[in-house]
Amino acid sequence: MESSGMTQLMRDLAPESFDDLIPLVALYRPGPLGTGMVEDFVAGRHGKKTAKLLHPLLEPVLKDTFGVILYQEQVMQITSVLAGFSLGQADILRRAMGKKKAKELDSMKEAFIVGAAKEHGIKRELAEEIFALLQHFAGYGFNKSHSAAYALVAYQTAYLKAHYPVEFMAATLNSYLANAEKVSWYINACREMGIQVLPPDVNVSGAGFSVDGHSIRFGLAGI
């Protein structure tokens, strides 16, 4: 979450709530970053771009992501809403798209086209276009529950780092106690944050890094 790319994305998106953090995790991956999805999402978030939906029924499914198919669950919802797929069928299609199973996709595509015509009178050409769109985004789609879980961990750690920086950095150093390179890197990070790392002291130091007032005491096991 602290990489330069993610930091820039957060500046561009300007999150205002926890719900705004969830799509960040799904957006900052190789697939979305190379397709224009990120730019479309950010523009939609700030009201600079209106999503062009292929069918009005897509609006409630894609409203929260500004017309961008971002999550795997949205692929499942769209097939269910437009073609009457059961959630079981929708999940089979999602997996087939993710693994690019050609035979399975061909049969599911025809079922989608037939279902869309039966449920909502959608013409074959439009159904094929929507299916192609789903297939394109399914390769990049991220599980929303996973994205939410990662966002929560990021939010919690960011809170601790902001409000309890000494304790947070001491715990971080202890997590890399056996990795001299990482320890050195995080000691430099402490200095940049204005946190002093005190030298090891046989009379004061414990095995690990510990909080010593507003400083961190070097742990004996890290020598």
Positions of PLM-derived features:
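Noncatalytic, beta-rich nucleic-acid-contacting surfaces in large DNA/RNA-processing enzymes
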Residues: M1-I223
